[in-house]
Amino acid sequence: MVKVRFLGHAAFEIVGSKRILIDPFLTGNPAAAAKPEELEADLILITHAHGDHIGDAVEIAKRTGAKIVAMYDIANYLVENNPGITTIGMNYGPTEVDGVKIVQVPAWHSSSDGKYSIGNACGYVIELDGVKIYHAGDTFVFKDMELLNELYGPIDLALLPIGGHFTMGPKEAAKAVELLKPRKVVPMHYNTWPPIAADPEEFKKLVGDKAEVIILKPGEILEL
């Protein structure tokens, strides 16, 4: 069994034979369901360099010894500024880390630390204990999402942004579901702040019977 806990915004904890964190933005996150010091991790996946996605990754990695997986440029930037942490830099494509299959895939978004552009944005398809999960990162919908289903499907769970303004809104995310054909979908990256206000029920209605939409509140867990 794999457990997926929504930590608020775009942050998730995935627990099976390994503990994985994705975009652990907790400090300063008004929707955060945990504190950085409460979390353990073997791997931390970062989708891009914006502060609401890198978040507390370095702090958690220093304390737990977790390996940080990120775009090559971001991985180098982090290790150069935080000696002692372990990073795995990628530039799209598949790899395997400690028994976890990871595919870093494109996302349509910018990636910077607020001053400098650092690498590209990405999403991840991960396979843990036979369960396939797609975290889209921050992105707009794009036609090549079809390839993720063709290459790595069936996807058991898709984690998709629906807040608009910086990412897909409900309409675009529903189209992404049509392209990805996942079994289950959890919306994310909405209602953290006013610019990304969105109604998850609208998204659920638009998806219809194309997938099972599960609306998680921060702190809630989905078992797969």
Swiss-Prot record:
Gene3D superfamilies named among the record's database cross-references: Ribonuclease Z/Hydroxyacylglutathione hydrolase-like
Assigned keywords, A-Z: Hydrolase
Keyword Nucleotide-binding: no
GO molecular function, one term: hydrolase activity
SMART domains: Lactamase_B
DNA repair is among the record's keywords: no
Pfam families: Lactamase_B_3
Family named by the database record: Belongs to the UPF0173 family.
HAMAP family registered for this protein in UniProt: UPF0173 (MF_00457)
NCBIfam families, per database record: PRK00685.1
Protein name, entry field: UPF0173 metal-dependent hydrolase TON_1314
Organism: Thermococcus onnurineus (strain NA1)
